């Protein structure tokens, strides 16, 4: 059973997050291992396994990138275990330049420049995310998979910039 079916939701990228949360809470209550404490060892094990599956499904579906990766996996694109990466050399060069810029900002300890950098990366991420949503809605899986790969780069860059921001603020 796929995660969308487990939560009683259609297998689409855009989903009702409130319904997802409510269904998660219902499933947690229904299959919590403590409810099976007086059951047989097999029932207890099954409850623990089912609870773990529910938690994994929840973590996967509630985060936009992992939800996109999971949806793509249902259509034959296993991005989580694939070995190849982005082949777009212009994009990769841009990522290298952005990483170098972030290193320069760190060396200079320039908070104002970092704030501008974070906004720029967020804008880039948001634009590419919107493109991914359209690609998933149109079921252009191969193109969406490439966009998700690029979003991973931007997400890591954004995370690095935010970590630097915390470091500079604590300094």
From Swiss-Prot:
Signal peptide: none annotated. GO terms for molecular function: ATPase activator activity; protein-folding chaperone binding. Keywords: Chaperone. It holds the Pfam family HSCB_C. GO terms for biological process: [2Fe-2S] cluster assembly; protein complex oligomerization; protein folding. Co-chaperone involved in the maturation of iron-sulfur cluster-containing proteins. Seems to help targeting proteins to be folded toward HscA. This is Co-chaperone protein HscB. It comes from Citrobacter koseri (strain ATCC BAA-895 / CDC 4225-83 / SGSC4696).
